[in-house]
Every structure is written in C-alpha cells, then in structure tokens.
Regions:
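The feature captures two recurrent sequence modes
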Residues: 1-163, 255, 260-313
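Non-catalytic, well-ordered alpha-helical scaffold segments
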Residues: 97, 151, 169, 173, ...
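Short coil/turn segments at secondary-structure boundaries
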Residues: 113-118, 170-172, 186-187, 209
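Residue-level preference for alpha-helix termini and adjacent loops
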Residues: 152-156, 170, 174, 202-203, ...
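Beta-strand-enriched cores of mature, soluble protein domains
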Residues: 156-182
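Extended, Lys/Arg-enriched charged tracts that mediate electrostatic binding to polyanionic substrates
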Residues: 177, 181-215, 219-222
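A recognition module on extended beta-rich or small alphabeta surfaces enriched in W/G with H and D/E
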Residues: 217-285
C-alpha cells in the first residue's frame, strides 16, 4: 500500500473517533499505532503486547500490589473469586487472550483491546455481545493516583474479575442491549447514570457490612478507603428510578454511593422495558449528586465535608 493510501486510511480511522478523540488517542495516531490497517471496524485492535515497556509492567505491579493488599475486607467476595479464577498475575500486564481462555469458559465473555474511549454505540454493541472493551495502554508512573480516562489497569483489574460471576455478567450484557435501545430513544444520559452508580461506583450490602464492587472504586486507592470509611458521602439504597435522575461527579470522589442488596437485585432491575420509565423520568427534574430525598432509603446521610461546589455532570 502506498504512503498516500496509508495516510488516507489513518485519517479515516481518526475521523471515526469524532467526539471521543482524547489526548491519549491522538498520541497513538501520531505513533502510527492506529492506522487503518490496525484499527478494526468495531474499534478493536490486537493487543500490542510487544509495546509494553518495563515501566508499564512495573506500574501494573505497583498498582496491583497496592490494591490487592488493601481490598480484602473491603471488596465483595465475588470480585476476589473472579480475580483468583482468572489467575490475573501481578508481575506483568496480562495477556487478554490468556484471560479470555478462562472467561469464555465461565460466562462466555471476552476482553477486547481498544485504544481508549470508543463511541457509545460501539461500546453498547460490544457489551450486548459479551465483549468488554478494555484500553490496552498503561498509565504513567506519575499518574498512579489520578487518570482522566480509563487505562488497562482500571479496565482489566477493576472490571474483568466480576465478569466471572454469572449474574453480573448477565447484567452487563443486558446493559449493553439497553444502551442500544436508549440511544434511539434519546435517553443515554439516564442510562449513563445507571452505569456510573453501579458498574463504576457501586457498593453492595453483605452480612459482613458494605463492600465495594464498582470498578472506579476498586482501581483507586483513595476512593477504596473514602467510599466505606468517610462520613462525607451519602450511602443510599439502590433505586433505579432515583439513580437515573441523579447527576454525578467525574472530578472528585462521589458525593453519593448507591448500595445494592445483591447482584440479582441489580440484574432484575434491567428486566422491565425502560422506554416508559424514560418518559416518566423526563417529566421530573434531575437531582444533584449530593441530594437526599424524603423517599430515599438512607443508610448514611453524609456530612458533606470537603464536597466540591462545582456543577455535577
């Protein structure tokens, strides 16, 4: 293929990310990783194992050790079981292909490598077909505690172990199918809130107390402590209508965490047709991330200490 054709293909691939072209994606295009030959129509790429540096593996090991040492007694048993079943090691960034050998046998899911955030429709299509799109690249050593977009550690360590659990795996598939429908109904904002407050920042009630299952918490040292120990945030019982009305924070720890009783409760919430629910909720005002209502099942009303004054998403 001549240079002009290659450049045209790369330009077409870059244009496909319109609206989601982050700095990390631009970096990969500039490096030639995402030429038209590399990027598939579903926005996946072959995981470039040969591009991981010693620094990448060291960052993975440091994050893995840090989180694994503090999560026992904080994270739900289902996550620990999934981590053990997958045999996800600490020494190196894992091979997605090797993870998939176990994951496919367990629940029919697989991890697919993507260069970063992908368009909504692509994301939902992957989930609906039991494919979890995971960023292949690792954060830099100076980004251990804060990263603007999800990297491989967040996506793989934070999300993938729970896909071993059949009920949670079913929920994720149902969410993907629901997302495809929500897009056609103009309701992505409401469905995004459900993902945020469950898959990313959810807590679960167990006989031993509250435990973490949300990947955004699991992959963060600070929020792993804050979400369970701090008096600042609200902790409110799960209510799908309430969640779909509630704005959230992307720049600080959460003001509110929603608590499920079980993964069955979470999956059952996705069974009804959401179309009438979207119509109902459009007629109601959205709620701030820290709001507490009279009908809420309040497990703990937050002290509000340290809350940011900026607007919620």
């Amino acid at each position: 293929m001549d240079a002009m054709a290659t450049a045209t293909q790369a330009g077409d691939a870059q244009a496909a990310f319109a609206g989601t072209l982050t700095d990390k994606l631009k970096e990969q295009f500039d490096a030639g990783l995402l030429s038209g030959q590399e990027l598939r129509p579903d926005f996946t790429i072959a995981q470039p194992l040969d591009r991981y540096t010693d620094t990448d593996h060291a960052v993975w090991a440091k994050l893995y050790d840090r989180q694994a040492s503090m999560l026992r007694g904080r994270v739900c048993d289902e996550f620990l079981q999934g981590l053990s079943t997958l045999g996800m090691g600490r020494d190196r960034v894992p091979s997605f292909e090797q993870l998939n050998e176990t994951l496919m046998r367990a629940t029919g899911w697989q991890v697919v490598a993507v260069p970063g955030l992908v368009p909504d429709a692509v994301f939902f299509e992957h989930l609906a077909n039991r494919r979890f799109p995971a960023s292949w690249w690792m954060r830099k050593p100076e980004q251990l505690d804060y990263l603007q977009e999800p990297d491989c550690f967040h996506d793989v360590f934070g999300h993938v172990p729970l896909l071993i659990n059949p009920v949670f795996a079913n929920y994720m598939e149902a969410y993907g199918k629901g997302g495809l429908k929500a897009a056609s109904l103009g309701a992505l904002d409401m469905l995004a809130r459900l993902y945020w407050y469950t898959v990313e920042f959810g807590l679960i009630r167990t006989p031993e107390g509250l435990r973490i299952y949300g990947a955004g918490i699991l992959s963060s040292q600070g929020e792993s402590i804050y979400s369970l120990d701090s008096a600042s945030p609200n902790r409110i019982g799960f209510d799908v209508r309430r969640i779909m009305r509630t704005r959230y924070r992307i720049d600080t720890f959460q003001k509110t965490y929603f608590v499920i009783d079980s993964f069955d409760q979470l999956f059952d919430a996705t069974r009804p047709d959401f179309a009438p629910l979207y119509d109902e909720l459009r007629a109601q005002p959205t709620l701030g991330a820290g709001d507490v209502g009279q009908s809420d099942l309040v497990l703990q009303r937050g002290s509000r200490e340290g809350w940011a004054d900026s607007d919620d998403v």
